[in-house]
Amino acid sequence: MKKKYWLFFLFVGWILCSCNSNEKKLNEVLAKAVSCAELGTVEYTITKLIMTDDDAFYKFGDRKIIFSCRTTMKAGIDLKDFVMDDVKVTDGGKTVVVNLPYPKILSFNMAAEDIKLEYSKVSGLRTSFNTDERNDLLKQGERAILEDAHNLGIYDDAKKNATDFFKALLTQCGYENVNVCFKGDESKN
């Protein structure tokens, strides 16, 4: 994983150093950036408690279980949806407007070693949680984290970091004004 990051940063450094003439290099720079396919701009590590209290009025006893899990979620720009028509140069080559795809979750990892059973209580005539019930509970927790991603601010951070990246990249290529917009910006809705 670190090797990918080093290669990416070497690639970006090479691009930044090789930018001389605006128009000619813009197409080269953006084509090389798009060839990366995904631009991961932010990574969150989230710890969540997943719990259930299985109260069945017709059964005697309690069933409770609590898991803690640590997940890693990366967000950024999927450059497969980016085309050169999304770049407009105006003001005689001084200003460039880049219209990027809206950020999305690029990877989500809830590794088995990061899931811990914190508490389990079974009393009365109840049976323990079986493997399928535990897996279903963990899947519900995963869905809850993904559904709450917007409230966590990961998309806002991904937009900010992508904006900073493209502004720095295109400023190094000689553009005085760089404006970065996002297609389908959900914050406008």
Region spans (language model):
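Sec-dependent bacterial lipoprotein signal peptides
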Residues: 1-17
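Domain-level marker for long, solvent-exposed, non-transmembrane regions
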Residues: 19-189
